[in-house]
Structure formats: C-alpha cells, structure tokens
Swiss-Prot record:
HAMAP family: LuxS
Details of cofactor binding: Binds 1 Fe cation per subunit.
Gene: luxS
Physiological role: Involved in the synthesis of autoinducer 2 (AI-2) which is secreted by bacteria and is used to communicate both the cell density and the metabolic potential of the environment. The regulation of gene expression in response to changes in cell density is called quorum sensing. Catalyzes the transformation of S-ribosylhomocysteine (RHC) to homocysteine (HC) and 4,5-dihydroxy-2,3-pentadione (DPD).
UniProt organism field: Marinomonas sp. (strain MWYL1)
Protein name in the entry: S-ribosylhomocysteine lyase
Catalytic activity: S-(5-deoxy-D-ribos-5-yl)-L-homocysteine = (S)-4,5-dihydroxypentane-2,3-dione + L-homocysteine
A single BP term in Gene Ontology: quorum sensing
Length: 170
C-alpha cells in the first residue's frame, strides 16, 4: 500500500492549533487544488469530543466558506479527521496559510455567536446521519480554545519523516 502524504509528517512535533498545506495538485484542466490540515489538537495528547467535532463539522463548513471563498478560492469540502484532532479542507485555489488561519479564527468567532442548538444547520434525521449526537456547548468550547491559543503554521519541511527514519521506527 502506498504511504500517504499525511503519514510522512512527524505528529510528535506538530503545533496545534495550526494550518499546514497537506497536498497541492493541479487538475488536467489547470485548476489548482489545495488540501489543508487544520490541526485543532496536539496529536496523541488531545482529542476533540465526539459531539463537539460533529457539531463543529456542521457549523465550520459554512462559516469557513463565508470567510475564505472568493473569486480565487472555492472550498470543496471540510471533513473531520478520523483521529479527531482536526479537519481536512480541500479547495480550489492556493490561499496562503496565513489567509486560511485568519478565516479559521473568524469562523470560530462565528461559532461562538450561535445562540441555540436549533441554529445548527442540517440538524435533522433527513440531512444528518447521527443527528442526535451534537453539542453546541462542546463546539463552542473548541472554538474558544482555538481563539485562546491562536493559530500557527506547521511547516512540511520541519515535520518531514525520511525513508530512513520510517524504516527504523516501523
């Protein structure tokens, strides 16, 4: 099985919260696609709560689009990581990590402004696969944590795991 790019970075040295370009590619028609690692928690030390990350998934996707989409950028998808330490965001365009960080913080401010569970989008059995597994309070605690800690940038070069290192530690 091929080694995916996300497993070529040292998770023991990642800052969090932090933005990292996880992958960049161009389509055959020339569109630039960028995948960002939006790391909310320090890997292997912290984890986002089940209900909090789920509610955040519903809120974050819309709020990030409000702040980041433009004539040059269009978000394709924002999805939680299986390890529950952050989200992956795929988009058309090449915004800087600093632009993404600013949009992320603005989106977290928006999460804090949500007044009630009834304001969470798509929160019903028809549009959500686990519609009862939500907590606005936990999502807002996560948003506050991001804003309190501020968002940094993780460098691929600094986190890169060499073939030799991987062979020694596998």
């Amino acid at each position: 099985m091929p080694l995916l790019d996300s497993f070529r970075v040292d998770h023991t040295r990642m800052d969090a919260p932090a933005v990292r370009v996880a992958k960049s590619m161009s389509t055959p028609k020339g569109d630039d696609i960028t995948v960002f690692d939006l790391r909310f928690c320090v890997p292997n030390e912290e984890i986002l709560s089940e209900k909090g990350i789920h509610t955040l998934e519903h809120l974050f996707a819309g709020f990030m689009r409000d702040h980041l989409n433009s004539n040059n950028v269009e978000i394709i998808d924002i999805s939680p990581m299986g390890c529950r330490t952050g989200f992956y965001m795929s988009l058309i365009g090449t915004p800087s990590e600093e632009t993404v960080a600013a949009s992320w913080k603005a989106a977290m401010e928006d999460v804090l402004k949500v007044k009630a569970k009834s304001d969470i989008p798509e929160l019903n059995e028809y549009q959500c696969g686990t519609y009862e597994m939500h907590s606005l309070e936990e999502a807002q605690e996560i948003a506050k944590m991001i804003l309190d800690r501020d968002v940094k940038v993780n460098s691929n070069e600094e986190l890169y795991l060499s073939e030799e290192f991987l062979k020694e530690h596998s």
